[in-house]
Structure formats: structure tokens, C-alpha cells
């Protein structure tokens, strides 16, 4: 008597399930690539690329020329030990301002898609809710990379230099891009909620400028009024600038070193922003557009 036949259906089911998962991954990748091309193509014609290139130049000129004389008179120039030159001091802030303005494009695209009902059509498709958002952020991160490169070139012209090894240079660039990605994600959520493309520039640029001016990116903490020292010292832009200066290094004896006390506040701010944005995205994307 022959033994009972073995049912092969579980193995088939497992294989089919694995193939289905792999197919979904490939489908999501293709969807992101198609959406990336859709979002990136108009930016080549609407002036966004020109703005991405021009913003770092304008910021560098706008910060360097007015602060060149006060830098020598009130800070003390290179002899003060604050920084070897003004270019070394302000370039980290300019890189942050550049990627911040590049991130605004993600909010503009999200607001436009929400206003025109494109997000509603996306929701009716077999597509993960995060896919359009991540595609828009992908485009913004590309623009952030462009802004970073232009900022470093401008900084090099006025005296900025990296004084540490290649690993620190990579860390500097990755930190700037990570900050740009977080800001792009936040701008996208704001644009999705407001559905007002015209409001994106003032709504997102004013906080960036205010926090940048009230930071140690332009002048040392001692030159601010005492009553605002706690805010200036602890706000995220100041902490980001301090971390970037440590990664860039300097020739002065008082140059910040890359250490846990210097980097921890920056990593804490980034982690807090990621948590807040993750929670916010679940609420925003769960809404019917």
C-alpha cells in the first residue's frame, strides 16, 4: 500500500507569496522612478534649477559683504580665535540656507498636486500613499545636493576650507543632505495640507530666514543680547552650524572638535524632527485629499 500523498500547495503558496512581494517591490520602484521624472521635468523649465543655483550665491554675497567690516571691528577678525576668516565662519550657514530653499520646491509641488486633485487620483491607484511624497522629496534632495555644491564653491572663493580628512568631508556633506531631506519632507506635508502653492514661499522661507539670522551662523553668541542667548544657543540652526563647523575644522586653536557633546544636540534635533514628521505623515496621508 502506497503512503499518503504529500500536499505541495504550501510550497507553491510560499513561492507565489515571495514572487508577489518581489513584484510589489519592483512595482514601487518603477512608480517612484516614473513620479520622479514627472516631478523633475517641469523644474527644468520653470526656473527652479536657476533658483537652486542662484540662492547660495545670493546668500553668500548678502552675508559676506555686509558682515566683512563688522567681522574685523566687533569680532576681531582672525586674531579673535572665533574662525580663521569670515568665509570659514559663514559657509556652514549658507549651505543650510541653500538646502532649505531647495526643500521649498517639494512643498510647492505637493501643494500644486493637492490643489489640482492629482493626489486624489494617486490615492485611487494601486500605489503606496508614501510613494508620491517620497518621489517629491527625492527631487528636492537632488536640488539640495546642487545647492550644497554651489555653496561650497562660493565658500571656497571667499576662504572656506576643509581642514580634516576625507571622512569628515563626507560627514559634512551627508549631514547637510540629511537636514535637507528632513526639511523637504516637512515642506511636502505643509504643501499637502495647505493646498496653496502661492503661500509656500512666504510660509516656509520666513522661518528659515528668521532662525538663520538668530543663530551663531552669522555672529558669535556674545554679540547677541543676553536675554536671547538661551534661544540662540539651543535652537536647531545654531546646533547644526556648530556640528558642521566641527566637521569642517579650522586652523585656530579654539576650533571645535568632532565630539559627542558637539554632535549630540544635532542628532537629537534630527531624531526629534523625524519622529514628529513620521507621526504627522500618518495623519496627513490618512486624510482624503
UniProtKB/Swiss-Prot annotation:
Q: Which residues cross the membrane?
A: 49-69, 88-108, 138-158, 166-186, 199-219, 266-286
What would be one Pfam family of this protein? ABC2_membrane_3
Q: Give the record's GO biological process terms.
A: daunorubicin transport; DIM/DIP cell wall layer assembly; doxorubicin transport; lipid biosynthetic process; response to antibiotic; transmembrane transport
Q: What is the membrane topology here?
A: Multi-pass membrane protein
Say which domain of life the source belongs to. Bacteria
The main location is: membrane
Q: Which InterPro entries match?
A: ABC2_TM, ABC_2_transport, ABC_transpt_DrrB/DrrC, T7SS_ABC-Transporter
> Where in the cell is the protein located?
Cell membrane
Please tell me one Gene Ontology term that the record gives under cellular component. plasma membrane
Domain (ABC transmembrane type-2): residue spans on this chain: 47-282
One of the record's GO molecular function terms: ABC-type transporter activity
Provide this UniProt record's keywords sorted from A to Z: Antibiotic resistance, Cell membrane, Membrane, Transmembrane, Transmembrane helix, Transport
Question: What quaternary arrangement does the UniProt entry report?
Answer: The complex is composed of two ATP-binding proteins (DrrA) and two transmembrane proteins (DrrB and DrrC).
Q: Which PANTHER family match?
A: DOXORUBICIN RESISTANCE ABC TRANSPORTER PERMEASE PROTEIN DRRB, TRANSPORT PERMEASE YVFS-RELATED
**In the UniProt entry for this protein, what further remark is given in the free-text comments?**
Was identified as a high-confidence drug target.
> What's the family?
Belongs to the ABC-2 integral membrane protein family.
Describe its function.
Part of the ABC transporter complex DrrABC involved in doxorubicin resistance. Probably responsible for the translocation of the substrate across the membrane.
Name of the protein this chain belongs to: Doxorubicin resistance ABC transporter permease protein DrrB
User: Which gene is the coding source of this polypeptide chain?
Assistant: drrB
Amino acid at each position: 500500500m502506497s503512503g499518503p500523498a504529500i500536499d505541495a500547495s504550501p510550497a507553491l503558496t510560499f513561492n507565489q507569496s515571495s514572487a508577489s512581494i518581489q513584484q510589489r517591490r519592483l512595482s514601487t520602484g518603477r512608480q517612484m522612478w516614473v513620479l520622479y521624472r514627472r516631478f523633475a521635468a517641469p523644474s527644468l523649465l520653470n526656473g527652479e534649477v536657476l533658483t537652486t543655483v542662484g540662492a547660495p550665491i545670493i546668500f553668500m554675497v548678502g552675508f559676506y559683504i555686509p558682515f566683512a567690516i563688522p567681522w574685523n571691528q566687533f569680532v576681531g577678525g582672525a586674531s579673535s580665535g572665533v574662525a580663521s576668516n569670515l568665509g570659514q565662519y559663514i559657509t556652514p550657514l549658507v549651505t543650510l540656507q541653500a538646502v532649505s530653499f531647495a526643500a521649498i520646491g517639494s512643498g510647492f509641488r505637493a501643494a500644486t498636486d493637492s490643489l489640482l486633485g492629482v493626489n486624489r487620483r494617486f490615492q485611487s491607484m494601486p500605489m503606496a500613499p508614501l510613494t508620491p511624497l517620497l518621489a517629491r522629496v527625492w527631487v528636492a534632495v537632488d536640488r539640495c545636493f546642487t545647492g550644497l555644491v554651489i555653496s561650497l564653491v562660493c565658500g571656497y572663493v571667499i576662504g572656506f576650507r576643509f581642514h580634516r580628512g576625507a571622512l569628515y568631508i563626507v560627514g559634512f556633506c551627508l549631514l547637510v543632505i540629511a537636514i535637507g531631506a528632513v526639511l523637504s519632507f516637512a515642506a511636502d506635508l505643509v504643501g499637502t495640507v495647505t493646498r496653496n502653492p502661492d503661500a509656500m514661499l512666504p510660509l516656509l522661507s520666513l522661518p528659515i530666514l528668521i532662525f538663520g539670522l538668530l543663530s551663531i551662523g552669522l555672529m558669535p553668541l556674545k554679540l547677541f543680547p543676553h536675554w536671547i542667548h538661551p534661544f540662540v544657543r539651543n535652537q536647531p540652526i545654531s546646533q547644526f552650524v556648530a556640528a558642521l563647523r566641527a566637521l569642517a575644522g579650522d586652523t585656530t586653536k579654539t576650533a571645535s572638535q568632532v565630539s559627542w557633546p558637539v554632535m549630540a544636540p544635532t542628532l537629537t534635533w534630527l531624531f526629534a524632527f523625524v519622529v514628529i514628521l513620521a507621526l504627522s505623515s500618518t495623519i496627513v496621508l490618512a486624510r482624503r485629499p
